[in-house]
Amino acid sequence: MTQNRVRTVFLLAHTGRPAAIRSAELVVKGLLRAGIGVRVLEAEARDLPLPGEVELVGEATPQCLDGCELLIVLGGDGTLLRGAEFARASGVPMLGVNLGRVGFLAEAERDDLDKVVDRVVNRAYEVEERMTVDVVVHRNGDIVHTDWALNEAAVQKAGAEKLLEVVLEIDGRPVTGFGCDGIVLSTPTGSTAYAFSAGGPVVWPEVEALLMVPISAHALFAKPLVTSPDSVLAVEVLPHVPPGVLWCDGRRTVELPPGARVEVRRGAVPVRLARLHHASFTDRLVAKFALPVSGWRGAPH
């Protein structure tokens, strides 16, 4: 007779936040009480009041999630994007609990922790896939860097003194060129992040598209562009101008020398997110940005 394998959840927390420490303690106790194993990074465990039953792993690699059914992330947007790196590399769904400000990637708030534990215990969640982008940097015809992003790849000026001089390209054809502070190349998920701050449109997650949003461009035609999800977007840094810098999800960066070319296309590997309820993205948008909807009556019945 084969023995049933113990269910295991990986917990990732921003241990610099007192709220994360308290939240982690509640989640761990609730899961262990239900007979679900919990795995935590050793470096984070030092800052958390964890019982001895918690499994500790020393190295932060995708393999540390082997055998886990879920990745629970406690923190703000930065911690959630860190969790997304683990989720993408391992294929394990991520369930985010927001301890920061907006937290569009999060599925629950700190006050919902009891519900989160209950839903995980009963497997009462669904998994959806979010589109990513793959990023390639070329220099003199050679590939010099590859990366990916869940929210956006941002090409920005490296210094404050001068504008970044670029030419934009879509599907192998030039579109326009100008001096700017940068260009945000975004997914629909990222449309409520940096692209939103740069004046880009909000795109519902179920809409498949790529966005190209200029940042403070010195040009008459500098509007946000929305393309097919199968388009290839490119930004070329002009030769003989100051260098730029590439940021992926605001976490990973590489310098872009003059003449560098950044290509962005639909990612081969999505990020899987665990969802606890069927709230529409419209309701999520209203709640996250505290949008005024008083006076709304709705369609007549």
Curated annotation (Swiss-Prot):
Chief localization: cytoplasm
A GO CC term attached to the entry:
cytoplasm
Tell me which EC number(s) this protein carries.
Answer: 2.7.1.23
Query: Has the keyword NADP been applied to this entry?
Result: yes
One of its GO biological process terms is:
NAD metabolic process
Catalyses which reaction(s): NAD(+) + ATP = ADP + NADP(+) + H(+)
- Family matches, as InterPro entries: ATP-NAD_kinase_N, ATP-NAD_kinase_PpnK-typ_C, NAD/diacylglycerol_kinase_sf, NADK
> Keyword set for this entry?
ATP-binding, Cytoplasm, Kinase, NAD, NADP, Nucleotide-binding, Transferase
List the GO molecular function terms: ATP binding; metal ion binding; NAD binding; NAD+ kinase activity
Superkingdom of origin organism: Bacteria
Active site (record annotation): D77 (proton acceptor)
Q: Name where it's found.
A: Cytoplasm
Cofactor or coenzyme needed: a divalent metal cation
The entry marks the following residues as binding NAD(+), namely D77, G78, R82, N151, E152, K162, D181, T192, A193, Y194, A195, F196, S197
Q: Could you say which residues form the signal peptide? A: none
**In this record, what's one Pfam family?**
NAD_kinase
Keyword Oxidoreductase listed? The answer is: no
What the entry lists under Gene3D superfamilies is as follows:
Probable inorganic polyphosphate/atp-NAD kinase, domain 1, Probable inorganic polyphosphate/atp-NAD kinase, domain 2
Q: Which family does it belong to?
A: Belongs to the NAD kinase family.
Q: What is this protein called?
A: NAD kinase 2
Q: Which organism is it from?
A: Streptomyces coelicolor (strain ATCC BAA-471 / A3(2) / M145)
